[in-house]
Design a protein with these regions (language model features):
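Non-catalytic pre-domain segments flanking phosphatase-related domains
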Residues: 26, 42, 48-67
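A metal-dependent, Asp-based hydrolase signature
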Residues: 109-152, 162, 166, 170
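Cationic, amphipathic, low-complexity segments that mediate targeting or membrane/lipid association
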Residues: 38-40
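Active-site neighborhood of HAD-like aspartate-dependent phosphohydrolases
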Residues: 56-103
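Single-pass alpha-helical transmembrane signal-anchor segments in small membrane proteins across taxa
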Residues: 13-25
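Asp-based, Mg2+/Mn2+-dependent phosphohydrolase catalytic module
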Residues: 55-62, 165, 169-172, 187, ...
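Intrinsically disordered, low-complexity terminal tails and inter-domain linkers enriched
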Residues: 173-185
């Protein structure tokens, strides 16, 4: 018994030394990690700060501002989604909401080269898709309800989103900074795609038409359509800034021709408009419409 205790006492210094070695190694690890975190922060923080600075840095040499309409000046996509939900309920015996919505998107995409965008094109796709998913079994009274759903989108009030009218009114009266002509003001335009009469009616119902020098409604927002807009506004591409919610339609093609762009995401996006986003020196991102005044 005494021999066992004696041997144990002899091992105590060794055990203590091992523990101290482990503690020392752990402390050294923590110190290295702390130093590494600081180094990483030194590398990362300037990037974040520079990115944030670039996002709010004022755009230069701008003489004309073009605005998208739907989901930029007024809400629209959420109404389309409500109609689509009711539509899927009407056709629930022929498939799940997910299946019918997927089939509808496919039908819309197929019809776009011939029908373009807008409520009327959407209504035709609703009817065509109903016939397709039901294999021709959908009843006439259901078709009538579907047509009514589509037509309901033609009578939206197009109420301007928060901050829109106040901001546009400010820009309408604002003098261009660093312009050769001290009294030169921005040219304002609505640049939107869709069906002509529907878009014109929404603009009039919104009450915003009086602020704009040019209203251009196109079948699609291609780079060439942006170049035509520049000619109509009598500005060079690098003197134009496009403001909109769709990266695919409002941002990417504008940047492609050398214009600037301001992206204001809407809370919901049509599946057809979803695309990969990227950064660009002439791109600014804002979350509220009023922030447009900070980048111009």
């Amino acid at each position: 018994m005494r021999n066992g205790v004696f041997l144990l006492l002899k091992q105590i210094p060794v055990i203590i030394g091992s523990v101290l070695l482990i503690i020392g190694s752990f402390c050294a690890f923590l110190e290295r990690k702390k130093k590494g975190d600081k180094d990483n922060k030194k590398q990362i923080f300037p990037i974040i700060i520079e990115k944030k600075k670039n996002m709010m840095e004022k755009l230069k040499h701008i003489k004309a501002i073009a605005f998208d309409a739907d989901d930029t000046l007024w809400a629209l996509q959420n109404y389309f989604e409500e109609v689509e939900h009711e539509y899927c309920q009407l056709l629930s015996e022929f498939g799940s909401e997910k299946e019918i919505s997927a089939a509808l998107l496919e039908t819309e995409s197929k019809n776009m080269p011939d029908l373009g965008y807008g409520c009327k094109a959407f209504t035709i796709s609703l009817v065509e898709n109903a016939v397709k998913v039901s294999h021709g079994k959908v009843e006439a009274n259901v078709i009538a309800q579907i047509v009514d759903l589509g037509k309901s989108l033609l009578h939206l009030d197009a109420k301007p989103l928060e901050g829109v009218e106040k901001t546009i009114a400010c820009l309408k009266d604002r003098l261009i900074q660093n312009a050769g002509n001290a009294s030169l003001k921005y040219k304002l335009a609505v640049f939107t795609k869709g069906e002509l009469m529907d878009q014109e009616n929404k603009l009039w119902r919104s009450g915003l038409q009086r602020y704009f020098d040019v209203v251009s409604i196109v079948s699609d927002k291609t780079p060439e359509a942006y170049r035509r807009l520049c000619k109509e506004l009598e500005v060079n591409p690098d003197e134009l800034v496009m403001v909109g919610n769709s990266f695919k339609s409002d941002i990417a093609p504008a940047l492609k021709i050398g214009a600037s762009a301001v992206h204001i995401p809407f809370h919901t996006t049509w599946a057809h408009e979803k695309t990969e986003e990227f950064e660009h020196p002439k791109l600014r991102r804002i979350s509220r419409f009023e922030e447009l005044l900070d980048v111009l």
